[in-house]
Structures are given as structure tokens and as C-alpha cells.
Regions:
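C-terminal regulatory/oligomerization modules of transcriptional regulators
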Residues: 1-16, 135-154
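N-terminal leader segment of winged-helix/HTH proteins
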Residues: 1-42, 106-108
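Charged, amphipathic alpha-helical coiled-coil/dimerization segments
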Residues: 4-5, 33, 60, 82-142
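Amphipathic alpha-helical recognition patches that constitute DNA-binding helices
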Residues: 16, 20, 24, 50, ...
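N-terminal helix-turn-helix DNA-binding core of bacterial DNA-binding proteins
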Residues: 23, 30-76, 87
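Conserved amphipathic alpha-helical interaction elements at protein-protein interfaces in regulatory
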Residues: 57, 91, 116, 146, ...
Length: 154
């Protein structure tokens, strides 16, 4: 590409592509996904784990409430809930007061699954943040939470 003022400006902007937030977040997520596959022997995904945790802690929830608690979008929750219901991890039913809503409930199998996965997920977190001291880990998680909160606000 011939050097021009515009091209030089673009080159300066893209030169450090490996340091862009999206790229770094994707790499971190890739590391998490790889570690999940290595460390968590329970047949469950990260999103399924979070959904089961929400139901285990809060009891029966409609899908909108699950979305608020887990930051999962409606279509993801609907797809997850369908798969998880087929596996017997949760039950889905129509809300008695508002037939448009679907209420999710963790089953005994779901409770066993989340309990079996929890120590491995904890271990995954320890390995993922092994190079950080406790204060750095807390600060990093705070930063990630704030980025997520900002994205959710629009």
C-alpha cells in the first residue's frame, strides 16, 4: 500500500491490532473455553452452568428474570432452556398468571449436575488467574464486570 497521509493514519491505528479490547477479550474467552474443556469433566457448558446456578440460588424464575440475572439474551435462554429440559436438567412451564411467560425450575438432576461441576469451575478460576495475586484478580473481575454492565446499559 503506497504511503499517504491517510494510509499512515490508518497504519498507526491498526498497527497495534493485537492490543484492541475486543481481540484481547476474545483471547481471554478462548483461554477460558479451552480450560473449561480441560478442567470441567461434567457434561455442561458455561452458559448452562450459569443458568443452573441462577435457578439453584433463586428458585423458579421466568426466562426474563433469568436473562437479567445471567446477562443472557432471550434467544440464548430459549435455546438453552430447550436443550436443558430435554436433558432433564430443568423443567419449563407456562406461568399460571401470565401465559406468555415461561417459568424455569431446576430439577434434581440439574441440582446434582451443578453441584458436581462447581468445584471444577472453582478450580478453573484458580488456574485462569494463577498469575494474579488476590488484589489483581479482584480488580480484573471488577473491570470485567464494569465493561459488561456498560454494555448492558446500551
Amino acid at each position: 500500500m503506497p504511503s499517504t497521509a491517510g494510509n499512515d493514519e490508518i497504519s498507526a491505528l491498526v498497527r497495534d491490532f493485537a492490543e484492541t479490547p475486543g481481540h484481547l477479550i476474545r483471547r481471554a474467552y478462548q483461554a477460558h473455553t479451552q480450560l473449561w474443556a480441560e478442567v470441567v469433566p461434567v457434561d455442561i457448558t458455561g452458559s448452562q452452568y450459569i443458568l443452573l446456578c441462577a435457578l439453584a440460588v433463586h428458585g423458579d424464575l421466568d426466562q426474563v428474570s433469568v436473562g437479567r440475572l445471567t446477562s443472557l439474551d432471550r434467544s440464548s435462554i430459549a435455546e438453552l432452556a430447550s436443550r436443558m429440559a430435554r436433558r432433564g436438567l430443568i423443567q419449563r412451564r407456562r406461568d399460571e398468571r401470565d401465559g406468555r411467560k415461561r417459568v424455569l425450575r431446576i430439577t434434581e438432576e440439574g441440582a446434582r449436575t451443578v453441584a458436581a461441576a462447581a468445584p471444577y469451575v472453582h478450580r478453573l478460576g484458580q488456574r485462569l488467574f494463577a498469575q494474579f495475586d488476590e488484589a489483581e484478580r479482584a480488580q480484573f473481575l471488577d473491570y470485567l464486570g464494569r465493561v459488561g454492565d456498560q454494555a448492558n446499559r446500551g
